[in-house]
């Protein structure tokens, strides 16, 4: 895939110590199979570079991401899509260096799941965050695992069960967002330059392992359980398929509660 046609821009800066990943299909920046594959390839190629100290993920255009491809959630594609997305999430959780994420505009569904797999989230105050999957008759599997340890069980359940969106200010209050800034990319770069750039890259990797050696295995184990629940039970239900079809057909869903 040529750089011009790739859904992801990838480059190194700060003398190879910072890997930049930029979602590059504005304005929606849909997290589809091509986007997931490009992100996994970039991480696989660069994360083990000895001088690397961090990753910064952001997006072109006014919005980070409207979410995953609904077409790819249909029964004939769902298993492949979900396993690929969860593979990306696992690789981000296993990153040996911090992943910083700069967020503007809408960050919804699968877009928020990808962002929440990072370590430090920088966001504009008016950015919007949500997991609207429940309104389509499904649920957000990765977010069900990533949000509770980040924002607490009660706040996570609010977002996961209601499907409502919150702004950056509320996200900061509940712990979803680490830093609020009018220019999240600049804030993330400043944080890197002030706190990470001059550290020993090898010692930083040990610190990352130490901080996450108990939490990451728990999240990954839960993700296995939730993925099976989604694929084997949810997608066998009438209402899950009906909700997705209704969204694609731009009509109201006919819930049968089964």
From Swiss-Prot:
Q: Which InterPro entries match?
A: ClpP/crotonase-like_dom_sf (IPR029045), Dienoyl_CoA_hydratase (IPR017602), Enoyl-CoA_hydra/iso (IPR001753), Enoyl-CoA_hydra_C (IPR014748)
Pathway connected to this protein: Aromatic compound metabolism; benzoyl-CoA degradation
Q: Please indicate if the UniProt record lists Lyase as a keyword.
A: yes
Report the EC code(s) recorded for this entry: 4.2.1.100
Judging by the UniProt lineage, the source's domain of life is Bacteria
Show the GO MF annotations: cyclohexa-1,5-dienecarbonyl-CoA hydratase activity
Reaction catalysed by this enzyme: cyclohexa-1,5-diene-1-carbonyl-CoA + H2O = 6-hydroxycyclohex-1-ene-1-carbonyl-CoA
What keyword terms does UniProt attach to this protein? Aromatic hydrocarbons catabolism, Lyase
Where in the sequence is the signal peptide annotated? none
- BP terms from Gene Ontology: fatty acid beta-oxidation
Q: Which Pfam families match?
A: ECH_1 (PF00378)
Q: What function does this protein fulfil?
A: Catalyzes the hydration of cyclohexa-1,5-diene-1-carboxyl-CoA.
Q: Which SUPFAM superfamilies match?
A: ClpP/crotonase
Enzyme type, top EC level? lyase
Q: Give the protein's recorded name.
A: Cyclohexa-1,5-dienecarbonyl-CoA hydratase
Family of the protein in this entry: Belongs to the enoyl-CoA hydratase/isomerase family.
